[in-house]
Amino acid sequence: MGRFMNLCSVYINRLDTYRRMVNKKISAGQMEELLKMVRSREVLDTGLKELYDNFDTAFLHLFPDFVDKFNDLLQPEERIVLRKGELLNTELRIFALIRLGINDSSQIAEFLRYSVNTIYNYRAKVKNKACVSRDDFENLVRKIHSVSYTHLRAHETR
């Protein structure tokens, strides 16, 4: 929770800094430079990468075994292998959101900045790789335990 509160504070500060810079450029009549900045995707792309990196880190902190447990639901030859430095890829991120209770494809699409159709396609593609029933797949993803739940269950059995 603290991580996301800090992240919100950082984003508010960045927004305020950006607002002040825009105001300064308007006051100085630097419209061309301002237009160039507004048309650039660099700030957006950097912010999105940071958001997804923070999401991936926080999610895997709560569900450290998620990738392994998710792969257990897939046929061995269809398991997801992450690239070096990658915490989650798009497929895993979609199902991480589902694990968190965000099931609506339009909400997932909005967060990941894809079309709803693309999210449907990813979901269908992954379900087709499953070694379990397609109908049960998402319910089984929702049952992947968090570290705190697993930790609590271990203490209950003692």
Predicted regions and their residues:
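Membrane-proximal linker segments that couple transmembrane helices to downstream signaling/catalytic modules
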Residues: 1-86, 90
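Cytosolic nucleotide-binding catalytic cores of signal-transduction proteins
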Residues: 49, 53-149
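Conserved small/polar residues in nucleotide/adenosyl-binding loops
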Residues: 150-157
